C-alpha cells in the first residue's frame, strides 16, 4: 500500500489534482484554491496511512506513544519505500522552513534599512515583479512594500485563524501560508495598480478647467494686464497647455491693433490732397540721401491717380502693432516698392506693365493654312516688320519724331528733276564767263566755228 504525505501543501496544485484523481477522489466543480485540494488530500489519502499503523501497534502489545517529530525520521518499509523516503524528505524540509520566523512577520521591520537585494526579496514574496532597484526607484518600491504589508496585516486581522489539533494540521496550516505563491490570485497587484492610476488622474483633472477659464477670459479682454495674468497663472502647468496659452496671448496682441486703426491714419494721395505728398518726398530725401530715388518717387506720385489704398496701410499697421508708423516710415516702404518697380522697368524697357507682371504679344497669322494665300513678305524680312512691334513699347515722343522723318522723304522723280535743273544752271554760268586762254574747251570751240 503506498504511503501518502502528511504535509500535502508541499505539492503543487496540479500535482494534488492528479493524485486525487488517481485515487478515485471526486474533485469539486470549477476551479478552486489550493487549500481545498490540500484538505481533500488529508481527508481521503493521508487518512489511509493511520489504520494499518494503529492495527500493527495493537497486535504488538502496549502502544508506544511518541510524538510526530520522532516518528518522521524513521523510514517506513513497504512497497513504496523509496517514494516515501523522497516525499518525506521534502516534507521535512518544508516544515523546517515554515517553522522559522519570517522577517516580514516582524512589525518593527524598517524598510529603509533593507538593502536592495533584501527589498527585492520582500517584494517577490508578496507576488510583485519589481524592476531594477536604483536610488531613484528605491523610494517607490519602499512605499509599495509598506502598502503590501498593511494590506497583508488587514487581511490577517479580518480572517479568523482556524484551531489546529494535531502536528499534521500544524504543518498543513504553515504550508497554506505559502499557497498564495503558487496560486493564480493577483488581487493585491490589481488593487495596487488601481491606486497608482488614481493618483495622477486627480492631479491632471484640474488643469484643463483652469486653462479653459483662462482662455475665455483672455478672449473677452484684450488688455495687456489680462495677458500677463494668464501667462503667470498658467506657468505652473507644464508642456503643451502653457505653449498653447502663450500662443493665444500673442495672437490676441496681434489682433488688438485692428480696432485702433482709424481712417484718419491712412494717407490718401491724389489730386485733392497734395500737401501730404510733398512732405513724404522730403522725408525720403532726408532719410535715404538719394535725390534720384526721391525724384522717381515724386514722379510716380504725379502720374498715379491713387497710390497705396487704405487696405495696404491697415495691413502695415497690423503687422507691427508695437509702435505707430510715422509718415517717414510709410514713405520708406512706398519708396522700396517704387524702386523695385523702376528696376524692373530698366531691365525690361520694352515690356508692357501689366497687373500680373506677365506680358504677351500677338502671334503673326500663319499663311498657307486654312486657305490663306501666300505672300512674299512672309519670306522676306522688312523694316516694316520691326516697326510693327517695336513702336508699341516706345515712348510717345519717339513715335512723333519717326512720323515727321517719314513725311520729309522726297520721291525719286523730283530728285532727278532738281538735279537736271542744277546741272543746266551751272552750264549756263560757265558759258557766260569770259574766254580765257586757259580754257580747256577753246580748241573745241574753234573747231565748231571753222566747221560753220
From Swiss-Prot:
What ranges does the record give for the region Linker, renumbered to this chain? 49-107
Its recorded name reads Lamina-associated polypeptide 2, isoform beta
The residue ranges for the Lumenal side of the membrane come to 431-452
State the residue spans of region: Nucleoplasmic: 1-409
Post-translationally, this protein is described as follows, namely: Mitosis-specific phosphorylation specifically abolishes its binding to lamin B and chromosomes.
Q: Which SUPFAM superfamilies did the record assign?
A: LEM domain (SSF63451)
Q: Name one Pfam family in it.
A: Thymopoietin
GN (gene name): Tmpo
Q: Where is the composition biased (Polar residues)?
A: 154-177
Source species of the chain: Rattus norvegicus
Q: Name one GO biological process term.
A: nuclear membrane reassembly
